[in-house]
Amino acid sequence: MKNKVLIGIFTLLLFACGSGEEKKEEKESMNSRDEIRLKQYQVQGAKVYATYCANCHQQDGKGLASLYPPLAGADYLLENLPRAACIIKNGQSKEIVVNGVTYNQMMPGNPITNLEVAEVLTYIGNAWGNEAGLVGVKDVDKWLEECED
């Protein structure tokens, strides 16, 4: 009887220890998936940026004098990703302050999908020295539902 109990406890401990390794491997593979998604979003986001954004914000993300704000090193962008998602999708006609400079040029909304918003935010959030990391489409979905007019 004691042997059966000991074998049962040993088996339970063996499976409990083994599941920790599986979770560790699963977590590492999720990180790998996120790294792959980050790279994919950056590549696709660069295409979206070139099509819809670069004309005003320039290829180097430095903006255009006092007309269009920079995205490179932009405090507003990095501190307000949810608001940036809303601006990209819906446009903006209000005044905006970026790196201490006030801009009052209207920005039209863009006819792009929520996935493309996530991709372009990932691209500009990690280009030109910015370090925002991966912007997921689920985050963008949530942010766009909460946009203020």
Regions found by a protein language model. Name each.
Residues 40, 46-72, 79-82, 91-99, ...:
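Periplasmic/extracellular electron-transfer cofactor-ligation site
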Residues 8, 19-21:
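Acidic, carboxylate-rich catalytic segments that either coordinate divalent cations
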